Regions:
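Active-site "cap" helix and flanking loop/linker of ATP-utilizing ligase/carboxylase catalytic domains
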Residues: 246-268, 285-354
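Solvent-exposed alpha-helices and their adjacent loops that cap or buttress functional pockets
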Residues: 21, 36-38, 90, 112-114, ...
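Peripheral (often C-terminal) accessory segments that flank ATP-dependent C-N-forming ligase machineries
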Residues: 309-421
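Active-site nucleotide/adenylate-binding loops and adjacent lid/helix of ATP-dependent enzymes
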Residues: 4-5, 100-181, 235, 240-251
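ATP-binding N-terminal substructure of ATP-dependent carboxylate-amine bond-forming enzymes
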Residues: 1-94
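Internal nucleotide-binding/catalytic subdomain
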Residues: 156-291
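Short, charged, surface-exposed secondary-structure boundary motifs
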Residues: 38-40, 53-56, 98-104, 217-219
């Protein structure tokens, strides 16, 4: 069987890496992929939103399964198109992908079906939004309604921050159409965690949880990013809280989507926060999280082809997980998530020994890997516990030489502090 992964980042490299381990898979293609994926897959120079070319490629190359990584093709209906062409594809259709595409839709869904989340109001009028912020005060959370590459959320700790964020979104239209409507939420305090699941209609197969680090710098300082690192397991989140989240969030959401005529098949990602009142939803995504995928898939002992086929065919599935821990660190271009330069040479990758390296934003230039995006590399290590995994990953990262990269030095600190207590 040949597999096609759609996308170009670290998440897609991790998916290709996992599919390549299957004895059922003859060849893995990634469209468009990147040069760093050639260890496990063949990059194909087709943009992830060029549906005509992707369909043609799938037909001409005997693709038995297509897995869609990023959100934008899902929102644009790639699954609907592939299914209409009789092609086997894994991911939600356009109607179901709205759970990520519109925060306003999702908040209304949770309100209607009593799924625990923060109190909120939705605004398109700038003056009304400002009046609401002044009434509620800080801390407060401002979210662009649509997709903004993980950067459309401001957790404002001061009134000034909140007013600036809403001005940028509604008046300056910082994120284009995505921020012509904003969701303003109460600030929730607690530990965040990511709970992803394979879903087909009402059938939900939860994965092990992970925690990512969204702030750019050590100590959770600096601007929000798409994620600067992740780890799994998350010992500071009790198993009982995960069970509550599965029963009060994942199952009711899958059922709610069916009732709304938007039955969901694919990866449902719940970004959650454990409050004093229990787990509450911060966000939903309609696909694997990035960078969480890069620490969860190395713990999955099942063949990913079997998992996808069982989910698509409605067959019973038992997920098997390694007891080992995984910590992964993002190496990003200096300046990310704001303005950054490309083209810095990356050396030392061939000296890494006991690490998994996923390429996110690299290119090949005259025989050298160079930086070609905001998040450039994801380096992960697996070990018997989080402390050992952390020690290993930072030892390996020190071998990478580049003037154009930076990374956080404290990925996993909350969990390791918990274990040490």
């Amino acid at each position: 069987m040949n597999v096609l992964v759609i996308g170009r980042g670290g998440r897609e490299h991790a998916l290709a890496w996992k599919f390549a381990q299957s004895e059922q898979v003859e060849k893995v293609y990634v469209a468009p992929g990147n040069e760093g994926m050639r260890d496990v897959a063949t990059p194909v120079a087709i943009d992830e939103n060029d549906f005509d070319a992707l369909v043609l490629f799938a037909k001409e190359n005997n693709i038995g399964l297509t897995f869609v990584g990023p959100e934008i093709p899902l929102m644009n209906g790639i699954v609907d198109r592939f299914e209409a062409e009789g092609l086997r594809v894994f991911g939600p259709n356009k109607a179901a992908a709205v759970i990520e595409g519109s925060k306003a839709f999702t908040k209304e869904l949770m309100k209607k079906y009593d799924i625990p989340t923060a109190a909120y109001e939705t605004f398109t009028n700038y003056e009304e939004a400002v009046a609401y912020i002044r009434k509620i005060g800080a801390p407060i959370v401002i979210k662009a309604d649509g997709l903004a590459a993980g950067k459309g959320v401001t957790v404002a700790m001061t009134l000034e921050e909140a007013l600036q964020a809403v001005k940028e979104m509604l008046q300056d239209v910082k994120f284009g159409e995505a921020s012509k409507k904003v969701v303003i939420e109460e600030f929730l305090d607690g530990q965040e965690f990511s709970l992803m699941a394979f879903v087909n209609g009402t059938t939900v197969y939860p994965m092990v949880i992970a925690q990512d680090h969204k702030r750019a710098f050590d100590g959770d300082k600096g601007p929000n990013t798409g994620g600067m690192g992740a780890y799994s397991p998350v010992p500071q989140i009790p198993e009982s809280a995960v069970e509550v989240a599965i029963e009060t969030v994942l199952h009711p959401t899958a059922q709610a989507m069916i009732k709304e005529g938007r039955s969901f098949t694919g990866i449902l990602y719940a970004g959650l926060i454990l409050t004093n009142e229990g787990p509450k939803v911060i966000e939903f995504n309609a696909r694997f999280g990035d960078p969480e995928t890069e620490v969860v898939l190395p713990r999955l002992d099942n063949d990913l082809v079997d998992v996808c086929n069982s989910v698509l065919d409605g067959e019973k599935l038992v997920l098997k997980w390694s007891e080992e821990a995984v910590i992964g660190v993002v190496l990003a271009s200096k300046g990310y998530p704001e303005v950054y330069e490309k083209g810095a040479i990356i050396g030392g990758l061939d000296t890494l020994e006991d690490a998994i390296v996923f390429h996110a934003g690299t290119a090949m230039k005259r025989g050298d890997f160079v930086t070609n995006g905001g998040r450039v590399l994801f380096v992960a290590c697996k070990a018997k516990d989080l402390q050992e995994a952390k020690d290993k990953v930072y030892k390996e990262i020190a071998k990478i030489k580049s003037d154009g990269l930076f990374y956080r030095n404290d990925i996993g600190y909350r969990a390791i502090a918990k274990v040490d207590c």
